[in-house]
Structure formats: structure tokens, C-alpha cells
Regions:
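Catalytic phosphate/metal-binding cores of nucleic-acid and nucleotide-processing enzymes, i.e., regions
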Residues: 1-112
Length: 112
């Protein structure tokens, strides 16, 4: 199960309205995020949030991408309009030979 699939499943279990907003560009053969920083758009009880879903090992790199001079103006505009941005990092953890569990680390993107 991919990080995006895990995130969607969790959001829906929590009662959020959630949809994948990244798309496949068949010409370039790459996935393109919404505004270069969003995989999932969710409406939750706390408000609207764009989620970048990844493995925990990629969280720092995704945060750097969002804060880059190319992406940050769009992300900042989203934040100023009242939206939230979160990077959800998933890991599969557990001792060898034991049952593995998915763990989630959520990092909130804030201005500054």
C-alpha cells in the first residue's frame, strides 16, 4: 500500500472528505502534485488541508521542496487563505519476524 493510499484510508476512517489531487503526466512520465506540493486535498472538522504523503525518510526532502523559492509562493498563498499544509510520513516498523505496524509522522508546514 502506498503512502497516498494509507493516508486516504486513514482520512476516510476519520470521516474526512478526501481526494487525490496529484495526476500522472503520461508525456513526461511523472506524477505531478497539485501546485507542486499536494497529493491529497482533505476537508476535515478542523478545516481544509493539503497533504504531501511520503515515507518518513523523504519527509525532510518534501519540506525543503515546499519551502523552495519555486513552490513556496503558492504554498504561502494557500496558508494565507486559511488552508493547512501537512507532510505525512509513513513507516513500517516492527522487529524481525514480528508483526509490522504502520506508523505515521505528521509535520505541519507553517510560515517562517
Amino acid at each position: 500500500m502506498s503512502p497516498t493510499q494509507r493516508s486516504l484510508a486513514l482520512l476516510r476512517r476519520q470521516g474526512a472528505l478526501a481526494a487525490v489531487v496529484e495526476r500522472w503526466n503520461s508525456y513526461a512520465k511523472v506524477r505531478q502534485d497539485l501546485w507542486r506540493f499536494g497529493d491529497i486535498l482533505a476537508v476535515t472538522a478542523e478545516g481544509i488541508v493539503i497533504i504531501q504523503a511520503c515515507g518518513t525518510g523523504d519527509q525532510a526532502r518534501r519540506l525543503e521542496k515546499i519551502k523552495s523559492e519555486i513552490v513556496w509562493p503558492k504554498a504561502r498563498q494557500w496558508l494565507k487563505a486559511g488552508g493547512k499544509i501537512q507532510v505525512w510520513g509513513w513507516a513500517i516498523r516492527g522487529a524481525q519476524g514480528k508483526r509490522k505496524r504502520s506508523t505515521l509522522t505528521i509535520t505541519e508546514v507553517v510560515e517562517g
